[in-house]
Regions:
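Active-site-proximal, substrate-binding regions of enzyme catalytic domains
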Residues: 1-108, 115-207
C-alpha cells in the first residue's frame, strides 16, 4: 500500500491529480491507505463545507472517490510499536500514526507533505526501526516529479497552474506568471528534494 497523509490527499485532490498519481505509481485507488480522520478533516459528509475546504466540486469528488476505495490506516497497540514510543513533539499524531503503520508493514510506502516530520525523524539517530523507514518515504515534490514523468506534461502543468494557491513551492516550480518548461519543472522539483535530503542529514533517499 501507499499510505497518504492528509496534506498530500488535500493538495493532490485540489490539483485534480489523484488518478495521475495512481498511474504514476502503477496502482489503483485501492492501493492507497488514508487516516481514518481524513473524511472529517476534509468535511466530506457536507458538500458545501467540503467545497469550501477543497476549493472545487471536482476536488471533493476525487477526495470522496479516494476515501471510498482506499484502506484506512490501522496501527497495532502502542506497546507493540516502537515508533509510537518515540514521543517527538515535532511529529504530530497523524504523521506518528503513519510512521508506525510503515513500521508494521515492510512493503508499504508513505507519501507525506509534512517536511517538518521528516526533519524531526532525521534527528533520531542510531535507532534501527527508524533508519529502515527512509527508503519508503516520499515527499510531495517527489510525488509530483513522478506524475510529471509519467503523465502528459501540459495537462499536469495546466492543472497545477490553475490552482497556484494550493502549494507555494509547487506553484513556483511550474511557473506562476508564465508556465515553466518540463526541464525547468523537473529541475525545480529535484532542487526541493535535494534540499530535503540536506535538511535530513542525507537520510531522505533521492529518486
Amino acid at each position: 500500500l501507499f499510505l497518504l497523509d492528509s496534506d498530500v490527499v488535500k493538495k493532490i485532490c485540489q490539483y485534480h491529480l489523484l488518478h495521475e498519481l495512481a498511474a504514476a505509481l502503477g496502482c489503483g485507488l485501492n492501493a492507497f491507505a488514508v487516516l481514518p480522520q481524513l473524511k472529517f478533516q476534509l468535511r466530506l459528509a457536507d458538500v458545501a463545507k467540503a467545497v469550501q475546504k477543497l476549493g472545487s466540486q471536482e476536488a471533493v469528488d476525487q477526495a470522496r472517490e479516494l476515501v471510498a476505495a482506499a484502506a484506512e490506516v490501522q496501527v497495532v497497540a502502542e506497546a507493540a510499536n516502537p515508533i509510537l514510543g518515540l514521543n517527538r513533539p515535532d511529529i504530530d499524531s497523524g504523521e506518528a500514526t503513519l510512521f508506525a503503520a510503515l513500521h508494521d508493514v515492510d512493503a508499504d510506502s508513505l507519501i507525506s507533505g509534512d517536511k517538518r516530520a521528516f526533519i524531526a525523524l532525521s534527528e533520531i539517530n542510531g535507532v534501527a526501526v527508524v533508519d529502515v523507514l527512509w527508503a519508503r518515504l516520499i515527499c510531495l515534490e517527489e510525488a509530483m516529479h513522478l506524475i510529471v514523468q509519467s503523465a502528459n506534461f501540459d495537462h499536469v502543468s495546466a492543472k497545477v497552474r490553475a490552482n497556484l494557491a494550493v502549494d507555494t513551492a509547487i506553484g513556483i516550480a511550474f511557473g506562476r506568471a508564465t508556465a515553466n518548461s518540463p526541464a525547468m519543472v523537473i529541475e525545480a522539483l529535484a532542487s526541493y528534494m535535494s534540499d530535503l535530503h540536506a535538511r535530513t542529514s542525507g537520510k531522505y533517499v533521492l529518486p
